[in-house]
UniProtKB/Swiss-Prot annotation:
This protein's name: Mucosal pentraxin
Protein source organism: Bos taurus
Signal peptide limits: 1-19
One Gene Ontology MF term: complement component C1q complex binding
Disulphide bridges, residue numbers: 55-114
InterPro entries (UniProt xref): ConA-like_dom_sf, Pentaxin_CS, Pentraxin-related, Pentraxin_domain
Pfam families: Pentaxin
CC cofactor: Ca(2+)
Native organism taxonomy: Eukaryota, Metazoa, Chordata, Craniata, Vertebrata
Record family assignment: Belongs to the pentraxin family.
Length: 217
């Protein structure tokens, strides 16, 4: 009953232009390089984050830098950013501070990425295709701001904007999930729809520019 009431309230107060959909089995396709194509995601709950787990799946053949997930506040453009600097080199930014994870032999094809971070220890953990990549430490004691713009397809150099086409994502993204706590990545189901901040089966979003929603291949 509580979940049903929450769903009704969310639908009643959706920002103008936003929609909520069950996107299971669907993907966002970003067909070409641009600084105008992106998807804005609205969290189901707005709260400061002292820990999180972020998971998503993506496919691209880009070899240049690109953004996978951009969470920006008015004080920190890279409050939370998952960024690929080059093939096999993944950057996690927390509060404008970054750590880099290197994958010796990155696979060609779709990747399933999960990253978690907790403020109490500052430890960030990255997994790729259900295998651990490593752990790094950053921003111990930090709290992510709650009033954020969350964007797929572009990297925010200012709050909600200042996009650079040369950092845009070209390809497909799906199954984006964000929790407000650390999930055991070792036991995380390959396709999991239990996340409480961003949930792919009840995603609130708005697509701008050349973005297409299609069934997953």
């Amino acid at each position: 009953m509580e979940k049903l009431l929450l769903g009704v309230l969310l639908l009643a107060f959706l920002p103008e232009g936003m929609t909520q959909k069950d996107l299971r089995g669907k993907v966002f396709i970003f067909p070409e390089q641009s600084d105008t194509a992106y998807v804005t995601l609205i969290p189901r709950v707005r709260k400061p984050l002292r820990s999180f787990t972020l998971c998503l799946k993506a496919f691209t053949d880009l070899t240049r830098p690109y953004s996978l997930f951009s969470y920006s506040t008015k004080s920190k453009d890279n409050e939370l950013l998952l960024f690929v600097n080059k093939v096999g080199e993944y950057e996690l930014h927390i509060g404008n501070t970054k750590v880099t994870f290197k994958v010796p032999r990155p696979p060609y094809g779709p990747v399933h990425l999960c990253v978690s971070w907790e403020s109490v220890s500052g430890i960030a953990e990255l997994w790729m295709n259900s295998r651990p990549v490593g752990r790094k430490g950053l921003r111990r004691g930090y709290t992510l701001g709650q009033d954020a713009r969350i964007i797929l397809g572009q990297e925010q150099d200012s709050f909600g904007g200042k996009f650079d086409a040369k950092q845009s994502f070209v390809g497909e993204i799906w199954d984006v999930s964000l929790w407000d706590h650390v999930v055991s990545l070792k036991n995380l189901c390959f396709t999991c729809y239990t996340s409480n901040i961003l949930n792919w089966k009840a995603l609130i979003y708005q697509a701008k520019g050349y973005v297409v929603v299609k069934p997953k291949l």
